[in-house]
């Protein structure tokens, strides 16, 4: 039976060209360790020129939840980060306060979450184009806002979830995710959404070995634990 919470269009890996770059993390042109988060102002573009950035040795202390101050980059609404490698020494990778654009952003070893998006509103869109992430024991993209996240031609390897609509944020809402041309290997779920809040997921030309690429949850608000209730079917 077709789920009303998601539209899922997945082809088997052998039936299409995997579009996520599978050649590994690019070789950095430079390496910068910073004691504080780098903020990118609203609407501004930060082109790192393929340098690697992190927060210094010991910054990752496991998978405990961090804040934006623990991130390597903090993007204000409409900001763009591009051509960068996030090193393994970080507690949080990139935080977006509102919709943002990430172009060819690579994470060599995710600590807690690679990308956190919050305070985006219905009708606003975040774009994650190219790039990839390795060794994310939990989530790559954590979506706490209420807009749409587009993930295009991204590569994920050894991960828990590529995208997760927040399962227990104190204030819940409908969220949307569009995934196209993504390659996801040796991981768990490509997408996890909350069916009870009306979340939608569209997966197109996803190249993955996941048993269930799209998973439905019953989300909740506040100090609670969301429950898995099924799978998205096309």
From Swiss-Prot:
Entry's EC annotation: 4.2.2.2
Compartment(s) where it occurs, according to its Swiss-Prot or TrEMBL record: Secreted
Any one of the GO BP annotations: cell wall organization
Cofactors: Ca(2+)
Annotated GO CC locations: extracellular region
Residue positions with a glycan: 168
Cofactor info, note text: Binds 1 Ca(2+) ion per subunit.
Pfam families in the record: Pectate_lyase (PF03211)
Transmembrane segments: none
PANTHER family: PECTATE LYASE F-RELATED
Record-stated family: Belongs to the polysaccharide lyase 3 family.
Function statement: Pectinolytic enzyme consist of four classes of enzymes: pectin lyase, polygalacturonase, pectin methylesterase and rhamnogalacturonase. Among pectinolytic enzymes, pectin lyase is the most important in depolymerization of pectin, since it cleaves internal glycosidic bonds of highly methylated pectins. Favors pectate, the anion, over pectin, the methyl ester.
Name this protein carries in UniProt: Probable pectate lyase F
Organism this protein belongs to: Aspergillus terreus (strain NIH 2624 / FGSC A1156)
